[in-house]
Amino acid sequence: MATRTGSAVWEGTLKQGKGTMRLGSGAFEGPYSFSSRFESGKGTNPEELIGAAEAGCFSMALAFNLEKAGHPAKRVSTTATVKLEPADGGFKITSIDLKTEGDVPGIDESKFKDQAELTKKTCPVSVALAGTQINLEAKLL
């Protein structure tokens, strides 16, 4: 299976510094800063990228589960709202709210919701965010 990468460079202090985040595929490269993360400044932030990853994975996984259940979707749209809050002298992602909609011929609301609940438990990004070991390699330059 595929291994994917993302990278980031940060220059300067927390509040005055700036950085760039990149996807290994080259599909995205964007600036981020204290302002884009904790205020409403221009640029992206880690939580926004986590939200996009969760929404993208969830939509694909739900379409797959619906198809396996005999109800191929015409369209699945998901928004993930990632909440970052102060905690223990730092910050913590406290919740991710998923809102998903599907155009799925021949399925009722109850079965659609059942498939969405199954997907919440099996989507690879959802599983990773529920608790994944983080391995660290640190090198001082």
What are these regions (language model features)?
Residues 1-52, 59-141:
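Extended beta-strand/beta-hairpin segments
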